Amino acid sequence: MQLNPSEISELIKSRIQGLGDTAEIRNQGTVISVSDGICRIHGLSDVMQGEMLEFPGNTFGLALNLERDSVGAVILGEYEHISEGDTVKCTGRILEVPIGPELCGRVVNALGQPIDGKGPINTKLTTPIEKIAPGVIARQSVDQPMQTGIKAIDAMVPIGRGQRELIIGDRQTGKTAVAIDAIINQKGQGVTCIYVAIGQKASSIKNIVRALEQHGAMEYTIVVAATASESAAMQFVSAYSGCAMGEYFRDRGEDALIVYDDLSKQAVAYRQVSLLLRRPPGREAFPGDVFYLHSRLLERAARVNADYVEAFTKGAVKGKTGSLTALPIIETQAGDVSAFVPTNVISITDGQIFLETSLFNSGVRPAINAGISVSRVGGAAQTKVIKGLSGGIRTDLAQYRELAAFAQFASDLDASTRKQLDRGARVTELLKQAQYAPLSTSLMAVSLFAVNKGYFDDLEVKQVLAFESGLHGFMKSSHAALLQKIEDTKKLEKDDEAVLAAAIADFKKSF
């Protein structure tokens, strides 16, 4: 048989021409082992730190450990269907979550997926959960108040928009209650709230959502829930997801408030992930970068200036500053604030509110210890009227606690000490407040004015709260215009002081 070279070359040519360029380049690897939500993968030579990985069954993971011949990843969500030998693909993307006002009123998981049974959320945008915090030039000093509606906080440890104020205390001291009251008080203030529940019982989160709904707060609140039944990876990621949702409002010249409840559980979840990835443990078995875990999160809460907002929105929003205020919560063990995570977060934040078990059990609620609670930047942001009226209260309380300790041993006390003790007892009583009952600025001003001018001095201690409640009702019915004026101007003029004094004296006669 004679072979014709030209025929062969024609055949080869036609084959080459018919070859389609449908080949795609993909970076993929193979699962070596999977356990406890941690997966070791062989291959993935081009993977990036923090990159999203795609597993079979529409499951995603996060590449955290990049080693010479393998990659350590955490799986976000269920991992029971993943087995040895499965193919894992790189996505080329960092983990992203949906953002925007469409999330308000909804409960979502750490990946921004709805878990409240109210159907899908049609958000238009997504954003990476990890972002670099605004730089020094982009920031503006904190000088606008973030009213919590809690007398003890707004008078003694005021919080400003863009501040990070730590709420710290043992279990069952009312930490969450303080944060939820602060969210409820933002109604009508133009502040969007994000509540991040980390490692809590699903029933507790349900109760919080119900309370927010009852007080009409859910319409401006996003709840990000990583319950105790979810994987450590989801608990660790949830705080960053919530922060990314809050930054949407900050960067567009609006104000947002985010509560992390709580960062102790987030640190424990991160410790679990790190130990399973065989990272070397340090103090209290936490990994070496646990400080960075919290600092990079809390630094993203800031007040940004108008130039930053204008540049971010490409000129769509002009002349408006944005803010993200953070209220991280830390749970201490038997009041030990010198443990690793509490000291870290204290040093990162702009002040802290200490809640004490002994005060809580003795009926002082919110159980705020005025002596060691501070707000490092909030003083500049405090409302003028509250600032003017609350000056003496903090010192009165601190001296009262000190004297009360001595008075237990002294049999005969001089008149001035007795007077100070009596006043301190009444101030302590006045600062008690029921849960879910935040006060407006004007009513708070009325209470502080009354205690400063000595209208409570001749009352029995147990009558103080009843007198205050009655006084508030009287002011609302008979002096609504004065309350509205204080609410609008945030000031108490000399003429108004006289009217207010007369009104309180008037009410006291009938009490």
UniProtKB/Swiss-Prot annotation:
**What reaction does this enzyme carry out catalytically?**
ATP + H2O + 4 H(+)(in) = ADP + phosphate + 5 H(+)(out)
Question: Where would you say this protein principally sits, based on its record?
Answer: membrane
Keywords of the record, alphabetical order, are: ATP synthesis, ATP-binding, Cell inner membrane, Cell membrane, CF(1), Hydrogen ion transport, Ion transport, Membrane, Nucleotide-binding, Translocase, Transport
Signal peptide location in the record? none
Please state where this protein is localized: Cell inner membrane
Family designation: Belongs to the ATPase alpha/beta chains family.
Question: What is the name of the protein in this document?
Answer: ATP synthase subunit alpha
Organism whose genome encodes this protein = Janthinobacterium sp. (strain Marseille) (Minibacterium massiliensis)
